[in-house]
Design a protein with these regions (language model features):
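Sequence/fold signature of self-assembling virion shell proteins
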Residues: 2-47, 164-186, 228-342
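Assembly/oligomerization interface modules of large self-assembling protein complexes
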Residues: 29-109, 162-168
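A general secondary-structure signal for short beta-strands and their flanking turns/coil
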Residues: 101-103, 218, 304-306
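Short, structured patches in soluble enzyme cores that scaffold and shape functional sites
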Residues: 110-112, 227
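Alpha-helical scaffold segments that mediate packing/assembly in large oligomeric complexes
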Residues: 112-203
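Long, well-ordered mid-to-C-terminal structural blocks that present hydrophobic/aromatic surfaces
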Residues: 194-256
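Short glycine-rich, low-complexity/disordered patches
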Residues: 23-37, 142-154, 216-224
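Extracellular structured ligand-interaction cores
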Residues: 96, 105, 129, 218-220
């Protein structure tokens, strides 16, 4: 690590020590519950998808979900003159999805060479924070869609998308509302000419039909599509206007020009390449245990010429209204490529 880098890194640690009001500069420490909301703000700033969904702080590690919204009819009439009684109807689901926040580690290492490159920038502190947060955010999203189980020791080689880190949103549907999963009648779901669904749009409509009827015509529904399906359909994206003079620090969630199943379509980062999910952004949540954010400022490892950070949080992926979400069994999807199903 260059001398200039070392000076800037020490200043960074001094700054963070004051921010978190901790005496620990080298080891890990728990973030005070009063500052936990700031951790969520950092997540939202660096990824558009995370800025659209619910990031919720909870004080209990196990409970039932909050159940934001229900879609139930509350408009009614009651003849009170004849003795009728107006009875308010609950706007949240009668039974929420159970949750259990489980520890997930986000340990990382950055080479001294990379840090030396950042040290030439005036915004070294921001650059360092963004890079660390970006990688954590992408994994947070990836596990949300791919996660199937919680292993005592996850295996990246066998589960490169974090399938064994913790259960994600699609697994929540498998576990708590299996009827919301569009599964193959045999071993495959074929999309394309002579397949089960001739077009991607037909497949999306079939997934949409899996959600409760009262939700299907609400205009907040969206469809999330994987990159293979977008490419198969030769779909194009809206191009956002970007000021070339302003740096872009938030990972964009790309919106597709075409609508599918009469819904706007998006392709978030790390979504399964052949995945389809119909829901609303505010129906997807990640619950974080407020007292369980553990951070570190980075520990020097001169033996390996790198800076190591050991961080963790306790979290759970939640679908607020299970009957307002549906997804395809993306592992079973095959596409017609020149007459061959692959």
């Amino acid at each position: 690590m260059d001398t200039n880098t070392d000076i800037k890194f020490r200043a960074y640690k001094d700054d963070k020590q004051k921010q978190y009001d901790t005496l620990n500069q080298d080891g890990g420490f728990y973030v005070e519950s009063s500052q936990a909301r700031g951790e969520l703000i950092r997540m939202r700033k660096t990824d558009e998808f995370l800025n659209r969904i619910n990031l919720v702080l909870v004080v209990r590690d196990m409970d039932n979900s909050i159940g934001l919204g229900s879609g139930k009819l509350i408009a009614a009439r009651t003849d009170t003159a004849k003795g009728g009684t107006r009875i308010p109807r609950k706007i949240n689901p009668s039974t929420g999805m159970p949750y259990e926040c489980k520890q997930v580690n986000f340990d990382s290492a950055i080479s001294y060479e990379t840090m030396d490159a950042w040290a030439h920038h005036d915004d070294f502190n921001d650059c360092f924070e963004r890079e660390m947060q970006k990688h954590a955010n992408l994994d947070l999203i990836r596990v949300g869609f791919f996660g199937k189980e919680t292993a005592d020791d996850s295996d990246e080689a066998l589960n490169p998308n974090g399938e064994d880190v913790t259960e994600g949103w699609i697994q929540a549907l498998r576990d708590h509302r299996e009827a919301s999963i569009l599964s193959p009648e045999s071993e495959e779901i074929r999309i394309g000419e002579d397949g089960h669904y001739a077009t991607v749009n037909e497949a999306v409509s079939a997934v949409k039909a899996k959600i409760a009827p009262r939700h299907r015509d609400v205009n907040d529904l969206i469809v999330l599509l994987g990159s293979d399906l977008v490419a198969h359909d030769a779909a194009s994206f809206y191009q956002k206007r970007v000021d070339p003079k302003q740096p872009v620090h938030q990972i964009e969630m790309r919106q597709i020009k075409e609508s599918y199943g009469a819904m706007p379509a998006f392709m978030p980062s790390c979504f399964p390449a052949r995945g389809i999910m119909v829901t609303s952004f505010d129906n997807l949540s990640i619950y974080f245990l407020a007292r369980a954010f553990r951070r570190s400022f980075g520990r020097r490892n001169d033996r390996l010429n790198r800076l190591e950070s050991f961080e963790s949080m306790s979290l759970c992926y939640i679908i607020e209204q299970l009957d307002k979400a549906a997804a395809i069994d993306f592992d079973a999807v095959k596409l017609n490529k020149s007459g061959v199903w692959k």
